[in-house]
Regions:
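Intrinsically disordered, low-complexity segments enriched in small/flexible residues
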Residues: 1-75, 80-83, 241-250
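Structural motif
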Residues: 5, 93, 127, 165-166
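Glycine-rich anion/phosphate-binding loops
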Residues: 62-65, 69-75, 100-115
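A generic local secondary-structure boundary/capping motif
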Residues: 67-68, 78-80, 114-115, 152-153, ...
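A structural preference for short, pocket-lining loop segments at secondary-structure junctions
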Residues: 81-93, 109-133
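Conserved mixed alpha/beta catalytic, RNA-binding, or beta-rich assembly cores of soluble enzyme
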Residues: 95, 102-111, 144, 151
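Short small-residue beta-strand/loop micro-motif enriched in glycine and branched aliphatics
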Residues: 98-101, 134
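Conserved catalytic cores of soluble enzyme domains
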Residues: 128-250
Length: 250
């Protein structure tokens, strides 16, 4: 049996088997950045129910429940911070908010994080934890794939470093857009990384797929992920990458 106090001491990683539990966005930020350096931007951005969408629950009711449970307005937090003294633009997704799904607000925050990185020529770091596009926002959600990719491609074209961190899970529209195109793609151990589920994937290509093909280790072995990094080493790894990617002043 594991107790929360034990897990808090190990960054929510099981000390026995190494399983990485999902963590809230603000906890992730505290683990990565220099103490007290994070300045959140656009915390007041609020999703709207443009479609009047109702499934088992009306979308506004679902949003309110998620906001009360997480203390967030939506499933992403972005801002600027320092990591080992280097200023970065950081966007972190929170799976606890409607499965970390990307709607108009999440897409806008990812885009604004990229725009800030571009404007100030500071590294962009995005930590993904998402079930994909938010179905309650329909086409508005799908539009975010294009918007986020457009900004990220401009960041890369300007030779501003982009580090993508994929955590469990990184799936659907987030996988199909910005999460997989970092200058360096990092994944946590055994993270679920995929576009669609087993049944859909197998049915689409008409053949049985290999075991573990949707896990970080498979993607790493095929060159899709550059590094698999345990949570306890993630800050240290990012510090090393920033030192490598950022040119020293002339």
């Amino acid at each position: 049996m594991l107790f929360n106090k034990q897990l808090d001491k190990t960054l929510r990683v099981c000390p026995n088997c190494g399983h990485h539990f999902r963590i809230p966005a603000k906890v992730r930020i505290e683990q990565l950045v220099d103490s007290g350096s994070f300045v959140e931007r656009d915390a007041d951005l609020q999703p709207v129910d443009a479609l009047g969408f109702v499934d088992l629950k009306a979308y506004p009711d679902r949003l309110m429940a998620a906001q009360l449970a997480t203390g967030l307005r939506d499933a992403a937090v972005w801002g600027t911070a320092t990591i080992d003294g280097r200023t970065v633009s950081l966007c972190v997704m929170d799976f606890g908010f409607i499965g970390g799904s990307m709607g108009s607000v999440v897409g806008e925050k990812v885009a604004r994080a990229g725009e800030a990185a571009l404007a100030d020529r500071i590294p962009l770091i995005i930590v993904s934890s998402s079930g994909g596009a938010r179905m309650q926002e329909g086409t508005y959600s799908l539009m975010q794939l294009v918007k986020t990719m457009g900004v990220v491609e401009r960041v890369k074209a300007a030779r501003v470093p982009f580090i993508s961190v994929m955590t469990d899970p990184t799936t659907g529209g987030v996988f199909a857009s910005f999460a997989v195109v970092g200058d360096v793609n990092i994944a946590e151990p055994n993270a679920l990384i995929r576009f669609a589920g087993d049944r859909v994937s197998a049915g689409t290509i008409g053949e049985e797929l290999p075991p573990g093909y949707q896990r970080a280790e498979f993607w790493f072995s095929h060159g899709f992920v550059d590094r698999i990094v345990a949570r306890s080493r993630l800050r240290e790894e990012i510090i090393s990458l920033l030192a490598f990617l950022i040119a020293p002043p002339l």
